Regions:
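Double-stranded beta-helix
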Residues: 2-15, 153-216, 319-345
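Conserved metal-binding segment of the jelly-roll/cupin
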Residues: 127, 133-154, 160-165, 294, ...
Length: 345
């Protein structure tokens, strides 16, 4: 029987080599992988201790200037995706440093980008002719094809977490970019111009709707206050604690079409139940400390640390003190395609 099986195997292998010359391959050899019963893990659970990598990030300031680098970033590469500049199969993340007196030159691209400020003060981001100051915990958007630059006229280094849909856009083969003739784009609107127009539950009469939120700085003091107020309204969700999502005030949807962003508070002593979802999610610890179990791995985290939970991995949290987590994922894309799924246990 084994001899017959080996003969069949050899015959098939000869056939596969024969059809390969015509750029053909047999589906039956890969069908179970292509159409799995449950999602294939396309990245691995991973964790970055900020206090360990911070000296390396600061050292990059001596290696290259912000203008030469264009964006001086240490990419957070998933250990299962080394060499691909990806933290998940669809998303990119990195830590960007801008030193006092530096400017990160203006450019634009059709990849959507988000910034979450990790530390420092005195820097700004300019988007589409308007500047906004960057404070720790602020969530800042640079939407598709909008001119944006960063500057630091302050006296201390400023670091933020970058999140982009680079792998997704590159997979689709539709990436475009353009450099601005000047390092800094002209400022055409007053600082805070977006606030009375879009951040007070009202809209200008003749607002022209785009595909991203017109609010490009979701200030942490306001978001944190919302979480605090929510804790007074009832008990936390058993899986997520107190969790809110950032929204586009025009549509009620996500701030950007390809990435959803969230902020959640885990009260001191909170132990969540287990959940999993199809959107691989990147987490940044804004405040607090605790531990997270992702699949079979447990990571102990503290403020400013970063970790990633891959698709369809069971996730649970324990907080040793009041903890605030910022997170982002490709959930909007999955929902738009009717693919998103979650389970709670």
């Amino acid at each position: 029987m084994s001899e017959i099986n080996q003969n069949v195997k050899d015959s098939r292998q000869q056939y596969y080599q024969h059809i390969s010359g015509q750029n053909l391959t047999p589906l039956w050899e890969s069908l179970h992988h292509l159409v799995p019963q449950t999602p294939n893990a396309n990245c691995a659970p991973a964790y970055w201790n900020y206090q360990e990598i911070r000296p390396l990030l600061m050292e990059s300031g001596n290696v290259i200037g912000a203008k030469e680098a264009i964006r001086r970033v240490l990419v957070l590469e998933n250990p299962a995706l080394r060499g691909q500049s990806s933290i998940t199969a669809t998303l990119y993340a990195g830590l960007q440093l801008i030193l006092p007196g530096e400017v990160a030159p203006s450019h634009r691209h059709n990849q959507s980008a988000l910034r979450f400020i990790v530390e420092g003060k005195g820097a700004f981001t300019a988007v589409d002719g308007e500047r906004t100051p960057m404070h720790t915990g602020d969530f800042i958007l640079t939407p598709q094809w909008r001119w944006h630059d960063h500057g630091n006229p302050g006296s201390e280094p400023v670091v933020w977490l970058d999140g982009l849909d680079l792998p997704l856009v590159n997979l689709l083969g539709c990436g475009f970019a353009e450099d601005c003739p000047e390092d800094q784009q002209p400022v055409t609107r007053k600082e805070g111009d977006y606030l009375p127009r879009y951040a007070a539950n009202m809209l200008p009469l003749r607002h022209q709707r785009g595909n991203s939120s017109p609010i490009f700085n979701y200030r942490y003091d306001r978001s944190r206050e919302a979480l605090h107020d929510l804790t007074r309204m009832g008990d936390p969700d058993e899986w997520e604690g107190y969790k809110l999502r950032y929204v586009n005030p025009v549509t009620g949807g996500y701030p950007m079409p390809s990435m959803g962003a969230f902020l959640q508070l885990l009260p001191k002593g909170f132990a969540s139940r287990v959940a999993r979802s199809t959107d691989s999610t990147i987490y940044h610890v804004v405040e607090g400390a605790g531990q997270v179990t992702i699949g079979n791995e447990t990571f102990h985290f503290s403020a400013k640390d970063i970790f990633v939970a891959p698709t369809w991995h069971e996730v649970s949290f324990r907080s040793s003190e009041d903890t605030v987590l910022f997170s982002f994922s490709d959930k909007p894309v999955q929902e738009a395609l009717g693919l998103f799924r979650e389970a709670r246990y």
